[in-house]
Amino acid sequence: IAYSLKLLGGEPLPMAMLGSDGADYLQRLESLDIDCRHVGQVQDTYTAQAMIMTDRDNNQITAFHPGAMMQAHANRIDVGAKASVGIIAPDGRDAMLEHAAQFVAAGIPFVFDPGQGLPMFSGEELAKFIDQASWVTVNDYEGKMLSDRTGWTLAEISRKVEGLVVTLGAEGCEVWVAGEKTHVPAVVPKQVVDPTGCGDAWRGALLFGLERGWALPRCAALGNRVGALKIAQRGPQNYTLDFAVE
């Protein structure tokens, strides 16, 4: 997410916990001029690792070890923190709950994007996240689960926040605002090489647009465009922009 946001011209402030093996990755972020003041390190444990297996149809199975991520709640968002917008993306369970409350206390609007972390939470907890958030983003599968667990339709969820986005992969995405749905078409990539990191590329673009006060469909369209660039390159941090952001 931070790579995408920085590439577009934003100034990300990632909050994360690395393990004792994380020095090279921290150096990588710093080489990209990404501010790492909120990246901590936990000794005697490994950095979170995901092994993602992708078939020829781009279906994926992920094996995940959380490692130091389980201590991510030790990072705190102070009441006086200065940020335009934040995101609650997949993280340790305690960190997601606590950081959402801390965003609210600091008066920082945020996106709730639970991703693969969604099954960790009860319907009551998910409802509270939605009440705290300014925006919600999910894929179509997560959207169904979110509706099932909260008992709210997508239209109802969209009325509780400033906007809801449901990503649909190659079909683009649906933007819900005040109960009304708008389809934002996908951008056709030059080639399909590797889907790993497409969601994070999209998230970074979303944050870039929200920080600038763009309407949600415009933010989603930029996300689709950056995601199309990412999928044409192998690896989550090897793509570059082929356009200027206006």
Task: Describe the predicted segments one by one.
Residues I1-Q49:
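Substrate-binding N-lobe of the ribokinase-like
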Residues L5, G86, W135-N139:
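Residue-level signal for inorganic ion chemistry
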Residues K6, V104, E211:
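Gly/Ala-rich phosphate-binding loop of Rossmann-like dinucleotide-binding domains
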Residues P14, R37-V42, A50-D94:
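Conserved phosphate-binding/catalytic loop of the ribokinase/pfkB sugar-kinase fold
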Residues S20, D44, H65-M69, P114-L118, ...:
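Short, acidic/turn-prone active-site loops that include or flank metal/cofactor-
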Residues E98, V104-P185:
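Conserved phosphate/ATP/ADP-binding segment of small-molecule kinases
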Residues G151-E246:
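Conserved phosphate-binding/catalytic region of the ribokinase-like
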